[in-house]
Amino acid sequence: MKSTFKSEYPFEKRKAESERIADRFKNRIPVICEKAEKSDIPEIDKRKYLVPADLTVGQFVYVIRKRIMLPPEKAIFIFVNDTLPPTAALMSAIYQEHKDKDGFLYVTYSGENTFGR
């Protein structure tokens, strides 16, 4: 899944921004959250997040759900490097394992209707 954030900003600018964030916010993780291309789930209002290092993947999914005002009958899935991270994993662990060379963690979200409507 390709990132529109990456295509809009050159590597040097992204790298400089993530380094500035890391210097200012020691216990926060810079995350870029974008909707999967062919998903019918709503678009998110912002894609840059500074999440607490001790936030779980499940808690981050909850944040996304609220921001896109996803109805309860819809499911949401997040992917990091095309894999589904464990819900109980800490965002800091996911970041250490999957962060991009530019210093951001790229998360893609997608949804499907769990009740067949």
Curated annotation (Swiss-Prot):
Membrane-related topology note: Lipid-anchor; Peripheral membrane protein
Impact when changing G116A: No cleaving of the C-terminal R-117 by ATG4. Defect in Cvt pathway and autophagy
The keyword Protease is annotated on this UniProt entry: no
Modification after translation (UniProt): The C-terminal Arg-117 residue of ATG8 is removed by ATG4 to expose Gly-116 at the C-terminus. This Gly-116 forms then a thioester bond with the 'Cys-507' of ATG7 (E1-like activating enzyme) before being transferred to the 'Cys-234' of ATG3 (the specific E2 conjugating enzyme), in order to be finally amidated with phosphatidylethanolamine. This lipid modification anchors ATG8 to membranes and can be reversed by ATG4, releasing soluble ATG8.
UniProt organism field: Saccharomyces cerevisiae (strain ATCC 204508 / S288c)
Subunit structure: Conjugation to phosphatidylethanolamine (PE) leads to homodimerization. Interacts with ATG1. Interacts with ATG3. Interacts with ATG4. Interacts with ATG7. Interacts with ATG12. Interacts with ATG32. Interacts with ATG34. Interacts with ATG19 (via the C-terminal 10 residues). Interacts with the endoplasmic reticulum to Golgi v-SNARE protein BET1. Interacts with the vacuolar v-SNARE protein NYV1. Interacts with the UBX domain-containing protein SHP1. Interacts with the vacuolar membrane protein HFL1. Interacts with ATG45.
Function: Ubiquitin-like modifier involved in cytoplasm to vacuole transport (Cvt) vesicles and autophagosome formation. With ATG4, mediates the delivery of the vesicles and autophagosomes to the vacuole via the microtubule cytoskeleton. Required for selective autophagic degradation of the nucleus (nucleophagy) as well as for mitophagy which contributes to regulate mitochondrial quantity and quality by eliminating the mitochondria to a basal level to fulfill cellular energy requirements and preventing excess ROS production.
Other facts noted in the record for this chain: Present with 2010 molecules/cell in log phase SD medium.
Residues where lipid is bound covalently (Phosphatidylethanolamine amidated glycine): G116
Family the entry assigns: Belongs to the ATG8 family.
Induction: Up-regulated upon starvation conditions. Expression is under the control of UME6 which acts along with a histone deacetylase complex including SIN3 and RPD3 to negatively regulate ATG8 levels and subsequent autophagic activity.
Subcellular locations according to the entry: Cytoplasmic vesicle, Cvt vesicle membrane; Cytoplasmic vesicle, Autophagosome membrane; Vacuole membrane; Mitochondrion membrane
UniProt main location, coarse: membrane
Gene Ontology biological process terms from the UniProt entry: autophagosome assembly; autophagosome maturation; autophagy; autophagy of mitochondrion; cellular response to nitrogen starvation; cytoplasm to vacuole targeting by the Cvt pathway; endoplasmic reticulum to Golgi vesicle-mediated transport; lipid droplet formation
Site keyed Cleavage: positions: G116, R117
Entry protein name: Autophagy-related protein 8
A Pfam family annotated for this UniProt entry: ATG8
Keywords attached to this entry: Autophagy, Cytoplasmic vesicle, Lipoprotein, Membrane, Mitochondrion, Protein transport, Transport, Ubl conjugation pathway, Vacuole
Result after altering F79A: Impairs interaction with ATG4, cleavage by ATG4, PAS localization, and autophagic activity
One Gene Ontology MF term: phosphatidylethanolamine binding
Gene Ontology, cellular component aspect: autophagosome; autophagosome membrane; Cvt vesicle membrane; cytoplasm; cytosol; fungal-type vacuole membrane; lipid droplet; mitochondrial membrane
UniProt entry tagged with the keyword Cell cycle: no
